[in-house]
Curated annotation (Swiss-Prot):
Family matches, as CDD domains: EFh_HEF_CB
GO MF terms, alphabetically ordered: calcium ion binding; vitamin D binding
Repeat found in the keyword field: yes
GO CC, any one term: nucleus
Protein name, per record: Calbindin
Lineage: Eukaryota, Metazoa, Chordata, Craniata, Vertebrata
Interaction with RANBP9: region residues: 2-7
UniProt gene name: CALB1
Binding site for Ca(2+) 4: D199, D201, N203, Y205, E210
Binding site for Ca(2+) 1: D24, D26, S28, Y30, E35
Binding-site positions, Ca(2+) 3: D155, N157, D159, K161, E166
Keywords for the protein's UniProt record, in alphabetical order: Acetylation, Calcium, Metal-binding, Repeat, Vitamin D
UniProt cross-references to PROSITE patterns, sorted A to Z: EF_HAND_1, EF_HAND_2
Length: 261
């Protein structure tokens, strides 16, 4: 099935989803190592079998990742390589998704109750807004299809809603700073202790200076994951989740807390 889709001159949103599932064997949400090499090999074979040349985007992709063992791509990168239907592709090209800071601001707009997730109807409105900002409109049936596919692509725990880290896969890998924090997340007890330690005035939120102190300590303790030279970027992206400069416990937990235990 993946082979026939890779031979297509135009790949529909549902076909793109099937291709992704085929190659993301471990369900991590990214293609790397053998998964990525399998994609490159099968893409070249499928196009050759169909008598088709690789597109310029495909050639660039093969040149960039074909000889690398450390390559890693997300859904966004694949959507730019394959000839995906225009409106679906636009969801990965919108201005709000070109930087992590803009993404965080967009997230805050839709996660209005600070619950830490976006449900189906909110996701539908989010996608509709992205398309409208690109001067594109789709009918309700197509919008529902896109919403359903986005849930299938990003809802890794199948709870019918998207958490921040799941939704962040709409970002290109190099822009997704949340990946840096995946390996250093704390359990709920540790996180609460850290929050109370850095909320020095005990007002229930962390301001920019308090966040700066927290990030400096995290960088010192986790030098393999975090680069202290990037603190300004980390801080700017995280503060985009704040409410008027006030970063509440539930907001910071989206970045640093792994769970309740």
């Amino acid at each position: 099935m993946a082979e026939s889709h890779l031979q297509s001159s135009l790949i529909t949103a549902s076909q793109f989803f099937e291709i992704w599932l085929h190659f993301d064997a471990d369900g991590s949400g990214y293609l790397e190592g053998k998964e990525l090499q399998n994609l490159i090999q099968e893409l070249q074979q499928a196009r050759k079998k169909a008598g088709l040349e690789l597109s310029p985007e495909m050639k660039t992709f093969v040149d960039q990742y074909g000889q690398r063992d450390d390559g890693k791509i997300g859904i966004v990168e694949l959507a730019h390589v394959l000839p995906t239907e225009e409106n679906f592709l636009l969801l990965f090209r919108c201005q709000q998704l070109k930087s992590c800071e803009e993404f965080m601001k967009t997230w805050r707009k839709y996660d209005t109750d600070h619950g830490g997730f976006i449900e189906t109807e909110e996701l539908k409105n989010f996608l509709k807004d992205l398309l409208e900002k690109a001067n594109k409109t789709v009918d309700d049936t197509k919008l529902a299809e896109y919403t359903d596919l986005m849930l299938k692509l990003f809802d890794s725990n199948n709870d019918g809603k998207l958490e921040l880290t799941e939704m962040a896969r709409l970002l290109p890998v190099q822009e997704n700073f949340l990946l840096k924090f995946q390996g250093i997340k704390m359990c709920g007890k540790e996180f609460n202790k850290a929050f109370e330690l850095y909320d020095q005035d005990g007002n229930g939120y962390i301001d920019e200076n308090e966040l700066d102190a927290l990030l400096k300590d995290l960088c010192e303790k986790n030098k393999q994951d975090l680069d202290i030279n990037n603190i300004t970027t980390y801080k700017k992206n995280i503060m985009a989740l704040s409410d008027g400069g006030k970063l509440y416990r539930t907001d910071l937990a989206l970045i640093l807390c792994a769970g309740d235990n």
